């Protein structure tokens, strides 16, 4: 069965393994999430469940949001994500999914929004080498030529140029679940995940995990 949770990144710390190795981990408050919708192949063309995370005051939600969550009977939520799975029979509306759904040693993919760093040049954004620093080059951090002249008379798509750095959807794959604290709904993941503290992330079974 496919597993997944919406969570909140709390920050990074370190723990020690039994053999004395120091492991850098990210602490994620994973769930509890509530199943608010089920999708089927017959009706929607694919099989999935939609889960909600983070309670929201119903007075601050519009009628569409309240009506959407009415079937689950668990109030309104701040964040919603879809989790595709082969079979949704194990879930029904209103079911609560908690951190205990994952076990130590599981491999997961984590999707979040990277930290926005504003407008950046090509050296910081793309790792360009830059030009000479001396001898009158007058070409230090500039991008250089961005294309030809008469032919093709345009700049090609996806040309690496200055612009917004960060603040985009990023997925980190094959992170190991180092520890699960079911009582407090905490999951410790080996390594770093996208985003800043208190950022919302989606944790799912790794698509590249060995079967």
Swiss-Prot record:
Entry-linked Gene3D superfamilies: 3.30.160.810, Translation factors
GO biological process: translation
Recorded GO CC terms: cytosolic large ribosomal subunit
Pfam families for this protein: Ribosomal_L3 (PF00297)
Keyword rRNA-binding: yes
GO molecular-function terms, A-Z: rRNA binding; structural constituent of ribosome
Transmembrane segments: none
Keywords noted in UniProt: Ribonucleoprotein, Ribosomal protein, RNA-binding, rRNA-binding
Complex and partners: Part of the 50S ribosomal subunit. Forms a cluster with proteins L14 and L19.
PANTHER family for this protein: 50S RIBOSOMAL PROTEIN L3 (PTHR11229), LARGE RIBOSOMAL SUBUNIT PROTEIN UL3C (PTHR11229:SF16)
Protein family per UniProt: Belongs to the universal ribosomal protein uL3 family.
Protein function: One of the primary rRNA binding proteins, it binds directly near the 3'-end of the 23S rRNA, where it nucleates assembly of the 50S subunit.
The protein, known as: Large ribosomal subunit protein uL3
UniProt organism field: Citrifermentans bemidjiense (strain ATCC BAA-1014 / DSM 16622 / JCM 12645 / Bem) (Geobacter bemidjiensis)
